[in-house]
Amino acid sequence: KIYKTQDLVLQVKQNYNPAKLNLKKWVDFFDVLCGDREFQKEAIRDAIIFLASGEYNSIESLVEDNFRKNDELQKRYKDVRDYQRNLPLPHKLSAVIDLATGTGKSYLIYGIAQIALGLDLVDKVLVLCPSLTIESGLKEKFEKLSGDDKIKATLPDSAVFKNPRIIDANSTIKNGDICVENIHAVYERTGSSINDSLKKNGERVLVLNDEVHHIYNSSSEQDIRKWKAFLLNPDFNFKYILGFTGTAYMDDEYFNDVIYRYSIRQAVNDKVVKSVDYVAEDEVSSSPTERKREKFHKIYDNHEEFVKRYRLIKPLTILVTKDISKAKTLREDLIDFL
């Protein structure tokens, strides 16, 4: 059966006890951090309500609440227990935010981290990502946001932790810190403070996972396969876990723990990202080698055209692959072609 993806998104209650969670104090913070990007505000708000309103004990209670009201979910699973058995991170306040690439995931991650620290929901935030490149980019963005005077001025007086220190796991993770690390560092026996800083303290730690589809899908990289095991490790006993991705699919199946979705189509319609022009694959050549050369010719000709048309901005052509090994192979093939 084919489902409409939006129908599979779990809806977070908008009616909750304001005495338990007061987000009105954070309105100015939302406005300065997100500007007019309402979808970012909505995503942060839904995440914080899920984690901090007291309406949910775990992802299971959110599923139960939605399953009763949603016919599409009832068609996807034979009953609510069947649904709950298939959750990837059970018995946690765990969920995924599906945000199209290029729509500002880093703002969401920072916003959720700062509010969770400010509300005293947690003492520390651990942001995990799959590579050094992503780690470096996130740290740089977070340092700018944490040091932004306009953002600082919006933080409520009641906020417990303000202007969090942005560190990596080479430093001891203290209360009020946002630690940004790539998943490989979690398994290094020397140099990483994650074990010492977080063991037995997981219930007071928020774990935010960038590019979370790496956890849910099979990978040839051993450390990536261990990522999920780390999140479920009883030695840490993490309670609050969120994932962020622009590709919330396991093979062709949409993730079953998504609480907010902002699709690429919606982003294009809202002019948040540019329209995507797809190159159709020709079936003229039967040989895989010939097809690859034809594809490279198209890409090269396209690049040359952009160089002429946009000569003042040095156009880049970016080739995206499934993983590092495929990228290395593609690099060699492209060098041979050129």
Across the structure, where does each feature detected by a protein language model lie?
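Short basic/glycine-enriched coil/helix segment immediately N-terminal to the Walker B
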Residues: 87-91, 172-176, 190-207
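Inter-Walker segment of RecA-like/P-loop motor cores
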Residues: 149-191
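SF2 helicase catalytic motif II
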Residues: 185, 198-236, 240
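Conserved interdomain linker/interface between the two RecA-like ATPase lobes of SF2 helicase motors
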Residues: 256-338
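Conserved helicase ATPase motor motifs in RecA-like P-loop NTPase domains
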Residues: 97-103, 211-215, 230-253, 271
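Conserved SF1/SF2 helicase motif Ia
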Residues: 94-103, 108-136, 312-313
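Conserved pre-motif I regulatory segment
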Residues: 13-98
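Conserved Walker A/P-loop ATP-binding site and its immediately adjacent core
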Residues: 108, 121-153, 321-331
